[in-house]
């Protein structure tokens, strides 16, 4: 059967493509010219093989409209540039620099390569993280130059998915240097590539210029997905407040924020941004104006709607907090203040507009965060009305609710002794239900506040004892779920394995562990409930608890807490005998072994027995990183070579000598010559005294 005649080869394929494009072009010229429309998202997702040509008249009319609506595009890095910055990121990750000077030279070389491409890198998905790391390792002058490159583009950068993170890092790292005086750059320090001199503006002036760039857009940026985080950082910097981007519980960290770790050379200076920093006096006026502008265009209804908005709520929290902490509690009386607009009636009487709004936020996952901020920062009069008219009437239901319980905890942290005593009596009937449902946030806060306010915790201990089993061992199982801690290996299913190799911890078990640790701090019946349970628990269960990262902290607390008695430790510690090797080689168990060193100061014979077990396993311990740390903490080299000195150290005699010796210096042993000099001086002094007495007589 004859085959169809086909042309083969690259040239034939190119010829067919040219003919096909020619046919399409001829067909398009026959159709009437239509007005060009902005492509939809579906059209943008598909690659366009052919773009139709419009007449010049339509093109001139439509291009300005597109420029007004589209986000500015700063271009893409070419292949060679991508490869260079990828290799630079790998070099930083390996961190094989011998000195800090080598690292600074490398950072400067990256800046040289990035000249003129700073905006491209900041908007690049693959290179923006590298820029964040470089900013963290840069000097103040390098950051100032980069700041100057970003000026004029911040309105677009703060709304960009990747560039916004670079802006945040730049603001945070530059903030501690705001109080430094700006020196005039010499003529040699001129950027030659584009003929632009090093920015003459000070860092404070640069921040003020950022504010002017964003001015007029605050209302929109409050709820913008990426810009809201950067706006919060900017507000904190203006206020001189510490900014911690790594903390997921902070007001500025995103839930999906990926940590950008920076490896530093030993001895390299690190700028700590978790402390208050000095800011120019003009910043306070700017901060007040910015906060006023943010809410000036919003009516009260929309402002209250931000309380339940998942993006606007954190900004609203920050505005309330900064308003009350930096401009005084008296600002709450100003009708234009954020707090006054949210809560116009500070009496908080039942049925009032303020009470209805406040009550509606108590059980809302987002709104309750704002309530916590208000409770923590509100003036005393407003807080007392909130506690009296809203919290106390609903205290039972608040303690049972998973979300509202955190608001109750904030109230317990602030109330006085008499009010705390009343709240304790009202919450105690709910304790059995809370223990059964593992809602331990409120009971733990109650114990903590009672210890601070010096309130008797015996009624709380009785309520706990009645809600738990009478058998001490079973009681501890109910408190800690020790049956679920089956061993040192905390394996997770493939789908549950966490990112970055961190072991996944059960939130319920973590809360129970923290609750039991807080019980151990309370003297009397509360701590006795735990101590009796530990003594009654089997050795296998105790060892499993010691090898669990969560329950191990309970055992460490039981051994080192001030409420721990010598009698308890003498009964409890022998359970670890013959298990020291297993514990010393385990990540969690090794911390317990370290705690045993301090816990056995007054029971030396037990410490000596445990040390002998470690000495018998010397080879295995020295082969393990964790084991070597235990070997060092127990001074096992001293144990093997100079047993007498180790004995004194094990009994804590060295600490007593250091406490008696001022400054911790070793007392100098006097030589025979020093003693002879002292005797001679004493004899000379006595002879002089006798001669003076004879002269007087």
Curated annotation (Swiss-Prot):
<dbReference type="Pfam" id="PF22493">
    <property type="entry name" value="PUF_NOP9"/>
</dbReference>
<comment type="similarity">
    <text>Belongs to the NOP9 family.</text>
</comment>
<feature type="region of interest" description="Disordered">
    <location>
        <begin position="664"/>
        <end position="697"/>
    </location>
</feature>
<feature type="repeat" description="Pumilio 2">
    <location>
        <begin position="149"/>
        <end position="192"/>
    </location>
</feature>
<feature type="region of interest" description="Disordered">
    <location>
        <begin position="484"/>
        <end position="505"/>
    </location>
</feature>
<comment type="function">
    <text>RNA-binding nucleolar protein required for pre-rRNA processing. Involved in production of 18S rRNA and assembly of small ribosomal subunit.</text>
</comment>
<feature type="compositionally biased region" description="Basic residues">
    <location>
        <begin position="1"/>
        <end position="10"/>
    </location>
</feature>
<feature type="compositionally biased region" description="Basic and acidic residues">
    <location>
        <begin position="11"/>
        <end position="34"/>
    </location>
</feature>
<keyword id="KW-0677">Repeat</keyword>
<feature type="repeat" description="Pumilio 7">
    <location>
        <begin position="575"/>
        <end position="612"/>
    </location>
</feature>
<dbReference type="GO" id="GO:0000447">
    <property type="term" value="P:endonucleolytic cleavage in ITS1 to separate SSU-rRNA from 5.8S rRNA and LSU-rRNA from tricistronic rRNA transcript (SSU-rRNA, 5.8S rRNA, LSU-rRNA)"/>
</dbReference>
<dbReference type="GO" id="GO:0000056">
    <property type="term" value="P:ribosomal small subunit export from nucleus"/>
</dbReference>
<feature type="repeat" description="Pumilio 3">
    <location>
        <begin position="213"/>
        <end position="248"/>
    </location>
</feature>
<keyword id="KW-0539">Nucleus</keyword>
<keyword id="KW-0690">Ribosome biogenesis</keyword>
<feature type="repeat" description="Pumilio 6">
    <location>
        <begin position="533"/>
        <end position="574"/>
    </location>
</feature>
<dbReference type="GO" id="GO:0030688">
    <property type="term" value="C:preribosome, small subunit precursor"/>
</dbReference>
<feature type="repeat" description="Pumilio 5">
    <location>
        <begin position="389"/>
        <end position="429"/>
    </location>
</feature>
<protein>
    <recommendedName>
        <fullName>Nucleolar protein 9</fullName>
    </recommendedName>
</protein>
<feature type="repeat" description="Pumilio 4">
    <location>
        <begin position="353"/>
        <end position="388"/>
    </location>
</feature>
<dbReference type="InterPro" id="IPR040000">
    <property type="entry name" value="NOP9"/>
</dbReference>
<dbReference type="GO" id="GO:0005730">
    <property type="term" value="C:nucleolus"/>
</dbReference>
<dbReference type="GO" id="GO:0000480">
    <property type="term" value="P:endonucleolytic cleavage in 5'-ETS of tricistronic rRNA transcript (SSU-rRNA, 5.8S rRNA, LSU-rRNA)"/>
</dbReference>
<feature type="repeat" description="Pumilio 1">
    <location>
        <begin position="113"/>
        <end position="148"/>
    </location>
</feature>
<feature type="region of interest" description="Disordered">
    <location>
        <begin position="1"/>
        <end position="52"/>
    </location>
</feature>
<dbReference type="GO" id="GO:0003723">
    <property type="term" value="F:RNA binding"/>
</dbReference>
<dbReference type="InterPro" id="IPR016024">
    <property type="entry name" value="ARM-type_fold"/>
</dbReference>
<dbReference type="GO" id="GO:0030686">
    <property type="term" value="C:90S preribosome"/>
</dbReference>
<dbReference type="InterPro" id="IPR001313">
    <property type="entry name" value="Pumilio_RNA-bd_rpt"/>
</dbReference>
<feature type="compositionally biased region" description="Basic and acidic residues">
    <location>
        <begin position="665"/>
        <end position="682"/>
    </location>
</feature>
<dbReference type="InterPro" id="IPR011989">
    <property type="entry name" value="ARM-like"/>
</dbReference>
<dbReference type="GO" id="GO:0000472">
    <property type="term" value="P:endonucleolytic cleavage to generate mature 5'-end of SSU-rRNA from (SSU-rRNA, 5.8S rRNA, LSU-rRNA)"/>
</dbReference>
<keyword id="KW-0698">rRNA processing</keyword>
């Amino acid at each position: 059967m004859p085959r169809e005649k086909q042309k083969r080869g690259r040239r034939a394929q190119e010829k067919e493509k040219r003919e096909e494009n020619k046919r399409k072009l001829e067909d398009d010229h026959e159709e009437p010219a239509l007005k060009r429309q902005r492509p939809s998202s579906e059209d943008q997702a598909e690659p366009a093989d052919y773009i139709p040509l419009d007449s010049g008249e339509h093109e001139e009319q439509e291009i300005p409209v597109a420029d007004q609506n589209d986000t500015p595009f700063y271009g893409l890095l070419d292949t060679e540039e991508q490869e260079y910055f990828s290799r630079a990121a790998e070099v930083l990750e390996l961190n094989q620099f011998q000195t800090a000077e080598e690292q600074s030279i490398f950072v400067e070389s990256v800046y040289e390569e990035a000249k003129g491409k700073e905006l491209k890198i900041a908007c690049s998905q693959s290179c923006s993280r590298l820029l964040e790391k470089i900013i963290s390792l840069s000097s103040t002058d390098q950051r100032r130059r980069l700041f100057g490159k970003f000026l004029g583009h911040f309105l677009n950068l703060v709304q960009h998915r990747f560039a916004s993170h670079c802006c945040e890092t730049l603001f945070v790292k530059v903030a501690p240097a705001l109080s430094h005086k700006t020196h005039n750059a010499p003529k040699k320090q001129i950027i030659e590539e584009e003929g632009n001199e090093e920015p003459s503006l000070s860092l404070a002036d640069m921040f003020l210029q950022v504010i002017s760039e964003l001015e007029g857009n605050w209302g929109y940026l409050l709820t913008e997905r990426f810009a809201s985080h950067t706006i919060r950082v900017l507000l904190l910097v203006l206020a001189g407040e510490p900014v911690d981007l790594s903390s997921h519980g902070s007001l500025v960290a995103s839930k999906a924020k990926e940590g950008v770790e920076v490896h530093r050379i030993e001895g390299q200076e690190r700028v700590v941004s978790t402390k208050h920093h000095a800011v120019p006096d003009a910043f306070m006026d700017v901060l007040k104006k910015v906060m006023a502008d943010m809410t000036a265009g919003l009516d009260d209804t929309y402002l209250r709607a931000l309380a339940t908005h998942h993006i606007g709520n954190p900004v609203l929290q920050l505005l309330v907090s900064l308003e009350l902490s930096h401009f005084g509690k008296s600002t709450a009386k100003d009708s234009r203040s954020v707090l006054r607009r949210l809560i116009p009636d500070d009496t908080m009487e039942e049925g009032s507009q303020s009470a209805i709004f406040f009550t509606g936020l108590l059980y809302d996952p987002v709104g309750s965060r704002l309530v916590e901020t208000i409770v923590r920062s509100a003036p005393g009069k407003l807080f007392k009305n909130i506690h009296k008219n809203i919290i106390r009437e609903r205290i039972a239901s608040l303690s049972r609710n998973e979300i509202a319980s955190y608001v109750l905890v904030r109230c317990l942290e602030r109330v006085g002794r008499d009010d705390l005593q009343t709240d304790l009596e009202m919450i105690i009937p709910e304790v059995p239900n809370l223990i059964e449902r593992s809602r331990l946030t409120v009971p733990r806060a109650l114990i903590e506040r009672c210890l601070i306010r010096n309130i008797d915790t015996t009624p709380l201990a009785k309520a706990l004892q009645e809600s738990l089993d009478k058998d001490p061992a079973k009681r501890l199982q109910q408190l800690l779920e020790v049956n679920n801690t089956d061993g040192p290996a905390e394996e997770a299913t493939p789908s549950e394995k966490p990112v970055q190799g961190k072991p996944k911890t059960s939130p319920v078990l973590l809360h129970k562990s923290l609750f039991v640790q807080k019980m151990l701090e309370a003297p009397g019946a509360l701590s006795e409930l735990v101590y009796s349970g530990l003594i009654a628990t089997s050795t296998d269960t105790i060892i499993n608890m010691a090898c669990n990262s969560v329950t191990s902290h309970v055992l460490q607390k039981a051994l080192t807490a001030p409420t721990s008695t010598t009698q308890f430790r003498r009964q409890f510690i022998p359970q670890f005998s013959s298990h020291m090797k297993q514990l010393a080689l385990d990540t969690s168990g090794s911390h317990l072994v370290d705690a045993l060193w301090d816990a056995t100061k007054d029971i030396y014979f037990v410490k000596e027995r445990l040390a002998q077990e470690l000495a018998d396993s010397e080879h295995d311990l020295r082969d393990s990183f964790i084991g070597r740390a235990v070997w060092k903490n127990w001074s096992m080299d001293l144990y093997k070579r100079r047993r007498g000195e180790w004995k004194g150290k094990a009994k804590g005699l060295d600490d007593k000598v250091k406490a008696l010796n001022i400054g911790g210096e070793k007392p100098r042993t006097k030589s025979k010559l020093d003693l002879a000099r002292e005797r001679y001086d004493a004899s000379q002094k006595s002879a002089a005294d006798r001669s003076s007495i004879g002269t007087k007589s």
